[in-house]
Design a protein with these regions (language model features):
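Hydrophobic alpha-helical segments and their boundary regions
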Residues: 2-3, 37
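Domain-level marker for long, solvent-exposed, non-transmembrane regions
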Residues: 18-293
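Sec-dependent N-terminal signal peptides
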Residues: 3-15
């Protein structure tokens, strides 16, 4: 009966509740674990999660090919990935997919964190499915001219892809490697945007935004008004407008197309954590200059 209760506690993520049960977890090769100490349970928990991350780094290293300074476009411009193996592994761990036991509370708190090796594999398997779903949604959005949705889905797919153990192995049915294709698709969308001024009334500038020759059905952007960056009102059916600072209307205006949608990612704790862990620099092609004359 005791063994059954312990098994249920481990599977359900309930605190094991005793040092003896924690030692059993540590001795069982089916689990990867970490423990931490601190002046509070919260501090000890952070230390335990960091220790677990370090141990998983060793496990994953055996079959993980680190992607270092991977260029997002075949032309060599745009977006570089510079991140450590440790930060990528950290991105697969969240408070929701690891288990915790509080061994001691108070100013000498002691906390254990663990995950079953099979659970770790399930995390990566589920992530692969999400990547393919995002890519399918992105391609459909491209076909209908929904630039915002296409960029968001492509970029989120890429963030998830970079967190896999072997990102270069995830391919499309024709054998194409998504690690190359997603960056190319992101840059192609940005290259196929054209922005022009259709008129202005004082400091209010009317814009026309085309995507592959047709009115963009949706796009989000920010712009430099001559003194600061401001959020634009968005694009609907190829039409938008901006308000420049008084007297700041110049021959060229700079827009920055939104593609990461970090605010929306806050609804997905796992995706948000990965965005924080991966050091992805901005896509250069997301900055668009257009002439007002």
């Amino acid at each position: 009966m005791k063994a059954l209760l312990f098994f249920l506690a481990v599977m359900l993520g309930a605190p094991a509740g005793s040092a003896q049960e924690w030692e059993a977890i540590k001795a069982d090769g089916a689990y990867i674990w970490g423990e931490g100490w601190g002046g509070s349970v919260e501090e000890a928990d952070r230390q335990a999660l960091a220790a677990l991350t370090s141990r998983i780094s060793v496990v994953v290293t055996n079959d993980f090919r680190q992607v270092e300074e991977q260029v997002l476009s075949s032309e060599g411009d745009g977006h570089y990935l510079r991140t450590s193996h440790r930060s990528i592994v950290h991105s697969c761990l969240t408070l929701s997919n690891t288990h915790r036991t509080v061994l001691k509370k108070g100013r000498k708190a002691h906390v254990g964190r663990w995950i079953h090796r099979d659970e770790l594999e399930r995390i990566f398997t589920g992530r692969k499915a999400r990547i393919l779903e995002y890519e399918q949604a992105a391609l459909l959005a491209e076909q209908s001219g929904r630039v915002d949705e296409a960029l968001r889905c492509h970029y989120w797919a890429y963030v998830l892809l970079c967190s896999l153990q072997r990102p270069s192995e995830l391919r499309e049915p024709d054998g194409g490697m998504l690690l190359n294709r997603i960056p190319e698709r992101l840059n192609a969308i940005l290259e196929d945007l054209s922005v022009g001024m259709t008129g202005h009334d004082g400091d209010v500038v009317s814009l026309r935004i085309l995507f592959r020759g047709m009115p963009a059905r949706g796009m989000d952007f920010s712009y430099f008004d001559g003194s600061r960056w401001l959020a634009g009102p968005g694009v609907r059916d190829g039409i938008s407008s901006i308000v420049m600072a008084p007297g700041a209307l110049a021959e060229t205006i700079l827009l920055r197309v939104e593609y990461a949608y970090r605010g929306d990612s806050m609804m997905d704790a796992e995706l948000r954590d990965m965005m924080d862990a991966l050091d992805l620099k901005p896509l250069k092609k997301s900055f668009i200059f257009f002439r007002t004359l």
